[in-house]
């Protein structure tokens, strides 16, 4: 071996030794990006534990986006945007989680009975009817009338306490699945129909009927004559909380 070759070999040995010392612990494992923080990142938890009134977004993406429209006493810990529900069903208010969540499986229902609802109404009539924010056909309804305990327990499978002193009245928690939630218990002050109804945006709404009629309905308490009307026409000035009723037909009979 020539002196030049020996010198070159010696230099290479020193270079390799220096690289090994600079590396430190000698770990030469090549780590892929999938072995790092991305793999250890925990999956986001669903903003709800269970849901009866699930809604799927119209966005054509996969996994799809879901939102739970259940009204609850307290949102799940994973919910980021918990908003107050209008006209909540619980004492002290109700809340809805408005988060959208991307998942293949939105999770189980909270109320197993919703899978086999009875088509029979638990109530004969209802003034404070509420349509649930679900999208089946026919729709789902709940009656929030305050009843005497004996009335509620006789008609409903489940009752809850109404707001106010305890013990007091009860509210039926049963859900009815059908197209017709039934008649009102308290008659509308203007009768069964109205052409000129004015209602606020509450749920249920408070309404007035400005129809000019030959005579007010028997249930009207504040019946006033329209000025300068000949023959005389009348308007019921009462307010009513609930649906104002269908349009009167034919209009000429008013």
Swiss-Prot record:
Signal peptide: 1-22
Induction info: By wounding.
Database matches in InterPro entries: Bowman-Birk_prot_inh, Prot_inh_BBI
Keywords of this entry: Disulfide bond, Protease inhibitor, Repeat, Serine protease inhibitor, Signal
GO molecular function ontology, one term from the record: serine-type endopeptidase inhibitor activity
S-S pairs: 51-248, 125-185, 126-143, 152-159, 156-172, 193-248, 194-209, 199-207, 216-223, 220-236
Domain of life of the source: Eukaryota
Tissues expressing this chain: Expressed in roots, leaves and flowers.
The keyword Signal is assigned to this record: yes
Propeptide span(s): 23-118, 252-254
Source species: Oryza sativa subsp. indica (Rice)
Sequence repeat residue intervals: 46-120, 121-187, 188-251
UniProt name for this protein: Bowman-Birk type bran trypsin inhibitor
Annotated site residues (Reactive bond for trypsin) in this chain: 135-136, 201-202
Keyword Membrane: no
SMART domains in the record: BowB
């Amino acid at each position: 071996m020539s002196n030049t070759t020996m010198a070159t070999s010696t230099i290479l040995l020193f270079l390799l030794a220096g690289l090994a010392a600079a590396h430190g612990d000698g770990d030469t494992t090549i780590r892929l990006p999938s072995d790092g923080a991305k793999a250890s990142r925990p999956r986001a938890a669903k903003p709800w534990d269970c849901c009866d009134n699930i809604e799927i977004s119209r966005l054509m993406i996969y996994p799809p986006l879901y939102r739970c429209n259940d009204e609850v006493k307290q949102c799940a810990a994973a919910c980021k945007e918990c908003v107050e529900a209008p006209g909540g069903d619980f004492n002290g208010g109700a809340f809805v989680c408005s988060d959208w969540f991307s998942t293949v499986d939105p999770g189980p229902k909270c109320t197993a009975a919703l899978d086999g609802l009875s088509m029979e109404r638990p109530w004969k009539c209802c003034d404070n009817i509420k349509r649930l924010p679900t999208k089946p056909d026919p729709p789902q309804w709940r009656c929030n009338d305050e009843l005497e305990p004996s009335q509620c327990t006789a008609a409903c499978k489940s009752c809850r306490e109404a707001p106010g002193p305890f013990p007091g009245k009860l509210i039926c928690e049963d859900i009815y699945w059908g197209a017709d939630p039934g008649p009102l218990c308290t008659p509308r002050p203007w009768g069964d129909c109205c052409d000129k109804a004015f209602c606020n945006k509450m749920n249920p709404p408070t309404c007035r009927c400005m129809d000019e009629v030959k005579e007010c309905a028997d249930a009207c308490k504040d019946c006033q004559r329209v000025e300068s009307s000949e023959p005389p026409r009348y308007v019921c000035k009462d307010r009513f909380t609930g649906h104002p009723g269908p349009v009167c037909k034919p209009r000429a009979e008013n």
